[in-house]
Swiss-Prot record:
Subcellular compartments: Cell inner membrane
Source domain of life: Bacteria
Stored InterPro entries: CHP00366 (IPR006161), SCFA_transpt_AtoE (IPR006160)
Full protein name: Putative short-chain fatty acid transporter
Residue numbers on the Cytoplasmic membrane side: 41-53, 124-137, 180, 335-351, 416-419
Keywords: Cell inner membrane, Cell membrane, Membrane, Transmembrane, Transmembrane helix, Transport
Main localization (coarse): membrane
NCBIfam families given in the database record: TIGR00366 family protein
Residue intervals passing through the bilayer: 20-40, 54-74, 103-123, 138-158, 159-179, 181-201, 245-265, 266-286, 314-334, 352-372, 395-415, 420-440
Periplasmic side, ranges: 1-19, 75-102, 202-244, 287-313, 373-394
UniProt topology in membrane: Multi-pass membrane protein
Length: 440
């Protein structure tokens, strides 16, 4: 049954799902029109919101571009390629490859979402290289399906924000400790269930041998060696460019800073620390500054989609927040809920909002001020209410192509190649989220 559903979804998506840039443009227009219809905003005020928000994610866009290029450059170093090859060698058949990539991506995203997105896609590509008969789009989809675990992991935006002083709802409910969110029984159940169950779900998505998509071999070719051999009479400038001493000095600075950071902040991994770790590790493993720069240049081609689309989603987010549309959607679901159904209703409201605001932090700003007071009034569990917002966002990412962009950029595929599999994963993983929110 799962195989038939995934084949239907793949055919449907291939026919109807546009490029992610077109998807973002259509969402912009849809948000604009619905906000005019349901809120007292005027066309002029909506245009101003969109324009004011358009550049609000520049810093975040730069962070995401860096995590792609630094992660890609790190994986193209000889030691990391060797590690990925060793891990990928555990898969002997296409079925084992699919299950291994799903498991690997799920665990990696629990550790850190940025790390999981990038390394999961690279691992999927390595499995495709080593296992003949693999369906490459399915393997990349499996890496992205691992993203289902991120919101309940150590880098989940909402549980961390809810426990951080100064967050948007602290004045309403105080701080909500991670013991009530990340380390709660329901979150452990949901996260472990996703890690264990989803490999078996993706296993059943395997296409028939006659339907396996053949991929251009160029996509699976090993990257060229970025090292440069200098002639004996090379000028001082070139010797400096290929100097290992300079790399070691900068690497030592980065390691020293990271040691101080973790000693002060504990296991608080942010996107900035991931980028710094990727950059320093990549620099050291490529050995010379220019070898690393050549690896970065080869990776930079993958960032085009993110650089163009981030401003559109920034504009959509501000329209959702300032027009009150996000609050209206949240209130609709809250008004039909009681104490027992409140977490599930919050989950579905978050999933709907995620189409327009695919950002964990953005969800907390939009939904937190509505969800937390309602949870208090109904006597619902505050920690579960926070995580319901997070779960809705991470669940609907399977139908929202925005966060698939890093994996697709690394893989050299388009969104239509993987989204049929991802939507199938959305349908079956939803049961796990609802059970966890209802029974615990």
């Amino acid at each position: 049954m799962i195989g038939r559903i995934s084949r239907f979804m793949t055919r449907f998506v291939s026919r109807w799902l546009p490029d992610p840039l077109i998807f973002a443009m259509l969402l912009t227009l849809l948000t604009f029109v619905i906000a005019l219809w349901l809120t007292p905003q005027t066309p002029i005020s909506m245009v101003k919101m969109w324009g004011d928000g358009f550049w609000n994610l520049l810093a975040f866009g730069m962070q995401m571009a860096l995590i792609i290029v630094t992660g890609h450059a790190l994986a193209s170093s000889a030691p990391v390629k060797s590690l990925l090859r060793t891990a990928a060698s555990a898969a002997k058949t296409p079925v084992q490859g699919v299950m291994l990539v799903t498991f690997f991506g799920s665990v990696a995203c629990v550790i850190n979402w940025g790390f999981g997105l990038v390394v999961g896609a690279m691992f999927a590509r390595e499995v495709a290289r080593r296992v003949p008969g693999s369906d490459y789009p399915l393997l990349i989809a499996c890496a992205y399906i691992g993203f289902l675990t991120w919101g309940g992991g150590f880098s989940g935006s909402m549980p961390l924000l809810a426990a951080t002083p100064g967050n948007p709802v602290e004045h309403i409910a105080g701080l909500i400790p991670v013991g009530d969110t990340l380390f709660s029984g329901f979150n452990i159940f949901i996260t472990v269930a996703l890690i264990v169950v989803m490999p078996f779900i993706t296993r059943m998505m395997m296409p028939k041998p006659s339907d396996v998509v053949s991929i251009d071999p160029k996509l699976l070719m090993e990257e060229a060696d970025f090292q440069k051999q200098l002639p004996k009479d090379a000028p001082p400038s070139e010797r400096l460019e290929e100097s290992r001493i300079l790399t070691l000095i900068i690497g030592a600075l980065g390691i020293a800073y990271l040691a101080m950071y973790f000693s002060e902040h504990g296991f608080n991994i942010t996107i900035n620390t991931v980028n710094l770790m990727f950059m320093i590790a990549g620099l050291l493993l490529h050995k010379t500054p220019m070898a690393y720069m050549r690896a970065i240049s080869a990776a930079a081609r993958s960032t085009a989609g993110i650089l163009v689309q981030f401003p559109f989603y920034a504009g959509i987010q501000l329209m959702m927040e300032h027009s009150g549309l996000g609050g209206l959607i949240t209130e609709f679901f809250i008004n039909v809920a009681n104490k027992d159904t409140f977490p599930v209703m919050t989950f579905f409201s978050s999933a709907l909002i995620n189409f327009a605001v695919p950002s964990g932090g953005g969800h907390w700003v939009i939904q937190g001020p509505f969800v937390i007071p309602a949870a208090q009034a109904l006597g619902a569990d505050l920690g579960k209410s926070v995580m319901a917002i997070a779960y809705g966002e991470q669940w609907m990412n399977m139908a929202q192509p925005f966060w698939a962009l890093p994996a697709l950029a690394i893989a050299g595929l388009g969104v239509r190649d993987i989204m049929g599999y991802c939507i199938t994963a959305l349908l079956f993983s939803g049961v796990i989220f609802v059970i966890g929110l209802t029974l615990f």
